[in-house]
Amino acid sequence: MAFKVVVSDTKSGKSYQFETESTALIGKKIGDEISGSVVELEGYKLKITGGSDKCGFAMRHDIHGAMKMRVLLKNGPGYNVKEKGLRRRKSLRGNTISKDVTLINTKVVEYGPAPLGGEPENTE
C-alpha cells in the first residue's frame, strides 16, 4: 500500500507531495510527530494534521480509532455549516492511520539541513 504524504512548509506557504511504501505510519494518530526520514527528508520532523481514505472520506481528530463512522456534526473538519443551528450526519474516518488511508497531510515542525523540495536556498 502506498501513502501520499503532503508536507506543508509553514514558512514559505508551499506544499510538497511525496509517496512512500513505509508501514511505519500505520498506527500513528493526528497530532503525532514523525521523522521526516519516512518520506526521505532527513533531519526534518513532521506533525500529522489530517488525511483521507481511499474513498475520499476525511480523517477527523476527535473520532478515535481507524474505522469509518457516520457522525452528527455541527462544525469542524469534514463539514462546513451553511446556516446557524444546522447539523448533518456525515461519513468520516477516525484519527488513526490504517491501510485504508491513502493521503496523509503533515506540516514541518523542525527543519533539516537540506532545503525542502530539492530547491536550492537563496544565499543572497
Swiss-Prot record:
GO terms for molecular function: structural constituent of ribosome. The keyword Cytoplasm does not apply. One of its GO terms (biological process) is translation. Keywords: Ribonucleoprotein, Ribosomal protein. Signal peptide: none annotated. GO terms for cellular component: ribonucleoprotein complex; ribosome. InterPro entries: Ribosomal_eS6, Ribosomal_eS6_arc. PANTHER family: 40S RIBOSOMAL PROTEIN S6. NCBIfam families: PRK04290.1-3. HAMAP family: Ribosomal_eS6. Belongs to the eukaryotic ribosomal protein eS6 family. This is Small ribosomal subunit protein eS6. It comes from Methanococcus maripaludis (strain C6 / ATCC BAA-1332).
